[in-house]
């Protein structure tokens, strides 16, 4: 009985232990196809929400996948709340601003979630040079796309 419990516990832990690098890679390819969007959504559904950055990526996954899911309004609202909640917790985190910027820039204009585009661009521009190299390169790749 203890072995069964231990197996399920470790299985659950391993499934939820996605690295931030894996999440970033999935996020950058999510807009390429419906399959990639669904893959990113599924990845974030299984990810432990142990950081504000992961919360924001989960919010982005909900917003990206909302059209495919048939729960457009609900998922857009929930995704926005996760992104805004993450930024509220860590307002100086540049990656959170990049996530919100990328979401707001790519949502259809009919969706009323576009108020922070200029604010986030300026924040990123002002703080990018101070970031560690891997994060700096990741954000530069988004900006230069």
Give residue spans per PLM region.
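Terminal, low-structured helical/coil segments at or just beyond the last alpha-helical repeat
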Residues: 115-145
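Helix-turn-helix repeat elements of alpha-solenoid scaffolds
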Residues: 28-42, 72-80, 113-114
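Conserved structural position within tetratricopeptide repeats
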Residues: 45-48, 81-88, 126
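Specific register positions within alpha-helical solenoid repeats of the TPR/Sel1-like families, i.e.
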Residues: 21-34, 63, 67-70, 105
């Amino acid at each position: 009985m203890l072995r069964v419990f231990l197996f399920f516990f470790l299985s659950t832990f391993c499934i939820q232990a996605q690295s931030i690098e894996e999440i970033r890679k999935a996020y950058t390819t999510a807009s390429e196809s419906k399959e990639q969007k669904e893959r990113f959504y599924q990845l974030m559904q299984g990810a432990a929400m142990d950081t504000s950055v992961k919360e924001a990526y989960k919010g982005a996954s909900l917003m990206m996948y909302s059209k495919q899911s048939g729960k457009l309004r609900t998922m857009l609202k929930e995704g926005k709340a996760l992104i805004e909640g993450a930024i509220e917790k860590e307002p100086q985190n540049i990656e959170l601003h990049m996530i919100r910027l990328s979401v707001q820039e790519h949502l259809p204009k009919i969706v009323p979630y576009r108020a922070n585009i200029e604010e986030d661009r300026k924040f990123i521009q002002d703080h990018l040079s101070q970031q560690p190299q891997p994060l700096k390169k990741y954000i530069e790749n988004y900006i230069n796309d």
